Swiss-Prot record:
Name the UniProt record assigns to this protein: Non-structural protein 1
First-listed, main subcellular location of the protein, grouped into a coarse class: host cell
Transmembrane regions listed in the UniProt entry: none
Molecular functions (GO terms): protein serine/threonine kinase inhibitor activity; RNA binding
Cellular compartment(s): Host nucleus; Host cytoplasm
Domain notes: The dsRNA-binding region is required for suppression of RNA silencing.
Subunit annotation: Homodimer. Interacts with host TRIM25 (via coiled coil); this interaction specifically inhibits TRIM25 multimerization and TRIM25-mediated RIGI CARD ubiquitination. Interacts with human EIF2AK2/PKR, CPSF4, IVNS1ABP and PABPN1.
Physiological role: Inhibits post-transcriptional processing of cellular pre-mRNA, by binding and inhibiting two cellular proteins that are required for the 3'-end processing of cellular pre-mRNAs: the 30 kDa cleavage and polyadenylation specificity factor/CPSF4 and the poly(A)-binding protein 2/PABPN1. In turn, unprocessed 3' end pre-mRNAs accumulate in the host nucleus and are no longer exported to the cytoplasm. Cellular protein synthesis is thereby shut off very early after virus infection.
Motif residue range(s): Nuclear localization signal: 34-38
Residues covered by region (RNA-binding and homodimerization): 1-73
Length: 230
């Protein structure tokens, strides 16, 4: 087992414990509590997969964090906070592309967790690119504002947007939703690629063909979704 995978899990367990203490003192808002619940389920799944006890991992994670904080000088901490904690807003789409109304000949809508996926199933044999506007923190996609699928002619044929009634979503939520949208569009022989900006901050990688590196879990979910639509 990769030691970095273990240490990452241990630190995540301890940080979840800290956030839980914050929630217990009624200091967390609704999105904070929503992420807390989602991350708890995620940690349970990861612990089961890795065969690690969460309570033990939390104690080890605490030791790792305490060691890092002890070694960190105040000046270095200030510089890290200033450079890393500032959330950036990145835009693939123009204001016109974001605000433009669009219509579907054969509408399909699916809710995936806190995200709503919409696509036009009448679109066939097109070259499509996915563009998104989103915020980034720690070099990773933090919050999706809006994602849209465009043909080469500029027509909008698909969309992923957060559900107002379910605030808060994770990077994994976004990647899973993108996998579902790609699967739905490719079912009609469309060629789909993802913008380099979105690839970089959602997957931290970039492929020349514009295809994101979907995990086996995301591929299975995409396949199940496609079968349910046929």
């Amino acid at each position: 087992m990769d030691p970095n995978t273990v240490s990452s899990f241990q630190v995540d367990c301890f940080l979840w414990h800290v956030r839980k203490r914050v929630a217990d003192q009624e200091l967390g808002d609704a999105p904070f509590l929503d992420r807390l619940r989602r991350d708890q389920k995620s940690l349970r799944g990861r612990g089961s997969t890795l065969g690690l006890n969460i309570e033990t991992a939390t104690r080890v994670g605490k030791q790792i964090v305490e060691r890092i904080l002890k070694e960190e000088s105040d000046e270095a901490l200030k510089m890290t906070m200033a450079s890393a904690l500032a959330s950036r807003y990145l835009t693939d789409m123009t204001i016109e592309e974001m605000s433009r109304d669009w219509f579907m000949l054969m509408p399909k809508q699916k809710v995936a967790g806190p995200l709503c996926i919409r696509m036009d199933q009448a679109i066939m044999d097109k070259s499509i690119i996915l563009k998104a506007n989103f915020s980034v923190i720690f070099g990773r996609l933090e919050t999706l504002i809006l994602l849209r699928a465009f043909t080469e002619e500029g027509a909008i044929v698909g969309e992923i947007s957060p559900l107002p009634s379910l605030p808060g979503h994770t990077n994994e939520d976004v990647k899973n939703a993108i996998g579902v949208l790609i699967g739905g569009l490719e079912w009609n022989d469309n060629t789909v690629r993802v913008s380099k900006t979105l690839q970089r901050f959602a997957w931290r990688s970039s492929n020349e063909n514009g295809r994101p590196p979907l995990t086996p879990k995301q591929k299975r979910k995409m396949a199940r979704t496609i079968r349910s639509e046929v």
